[in-house]
Design a protein with these regions (language model features):
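Glycine-rich, acidic/polar active-site loops that bind/position phosphate-bearing ligands
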Residues: 1-330
Length: 330
């Protein structure tokens, strides 16, 4: 193991002088290990840059807090009360205020570790939250940040007497935890090649989407790496089940968000929060580059709910995803 250069990072939420030193795997001969996920992402980023492009990435990670003192997994008690959460509180300001001590410590640790934590929201599940990380033109750092953020959340939760999980589907009836990846591409002049001044975005954006959709079934193992991951990928659960794309459509696997043209990008919504961020970003960037270089054309963007339409299906089980991955030439 050799340090990545990101650290040592002091654990701000513990009293002892303890630090984390992120490392990468190397072979005895001194070469980087071919199975190191960070190295795989570095290799893909190198290919994107060799094509004259710079990927810009931002991540969104969802997680659940739970009561570690209870028998079985249960939602947490609301701080300052003896009341347990009994329902989700989507976008609740009151809930964020109640957990302010927890989120304040999250932001303090992120600032100390140069993890660009931005907006925090309460999600639809009981004790479920999401934190957005700001975009960066360093895709490897984006993956580092996502991994470090998960470490921070778990550690700060322990400080507050809570548990935190990024499991894809911790509760059978509540929403799963997603890892959403926003991506745009800059040319050598720094211009966003996905922006052509329209809401639809440029033909290059369409080609990137085509690459994503074409490779998505074969790549699902990266996005859903565990048996539990496939419990999240179910219809009507705020998670995609098809290789599909749409304009500002949250049932799609690939969403083109509304907003300023200069920020035109795609949002990849398949991955669970349990996925390896290095492998997810590597797979997404490689797929987008494949589509761009082939000048591929995607199917027509769908409207409405993807759950109600005949669209190409993603693997529905771990076994199916393994078979698709093993026989893929991507």
């Amino acid at each position: 193991l050799k340090p990545t250069g990101r650290g040592p990072l002091q654990l701000t939420w513990v009293d002892d002088d303890v630090s984390l030193l992120p490392c990468q795997m190397y072979l005895h001969e001194g070469e980087i290990s071919p199975i190191d996920p960070r190295a795989q992402l570095e290799a893909v980023v190198g290919k994107v840059r060799a094509a004259g492009l710079t990927p810009v990435c931002a991540t969104e990670l969802e997680f659940y807090l739970y009561d570690v003192a209870s028998t079985g997994m249960q939602p947490p008690l609301i701080p300052g009360t003896a009341s347990r959460m009994t329902a989700g509180s989507l976008y609740s300001i009151d809930l964020l205020e109640a957990f302010k001590g927890f989120t304040d410590d999250i932001y303090a640790a992120c600032e100390a570790w140069d993890v660009p934590a931005d907006a925090a929201i309460s999600e639809s599940g009981m004790g479920q939250f999401e934190v957005n990380l700001l975009h960066t033109d360093d895709a490897v750092k984006a993956a580092d940040d996502a991994l470090l953020f998960k470490f921070i959340v778990r550690g700060v939760a322990r400080k507050h007497g809570l548990g935190a999980t990024f499991m894809a589907k911790p509760y059978g009836e509540d929403a799963g935890n997603g890892f959403h990846l926003h991506t745009s591409m800059l040319d050598q002049s720094g211009a966003n090649i996905f922006d052509n001044g329209t809401d639809l975005g440029s033909p290059v954006l369409a080609s990137a989407v085509a690459g994503l959709l074409d490779t998505m079934p074969d790549s699902t193992l990266f996005f859903a790496p565990h048996l539990n991951s496939f419990r999240r990928l179910r219809e009507g659960t705020h998670a995609p089940t098809t290789a599909s794309w749409g304009m500002d459509n949250r049932t799609a696997a690939v969403r083109i968000p509304a907003g300023p043209n200069a920020a035109r990008r795609f949002e990849h919504r398949v991955s669970g929060a349990d996925a390896n961020p290095y492998l997810v970003i590597a797979a997404v960037l490689a797929a987008a580059l494949k589509g761009i270089e082939a000048e591929a054309t995607p199917p027509v963007a769908f409207t409405g709910s993807s759950y109600d339409q005949e669209l190409p299906r993603l693997p529905a089980s771990w076994e199916e995803a393994l078979v698709r991955f093993e026989h893929s030439d991507f």
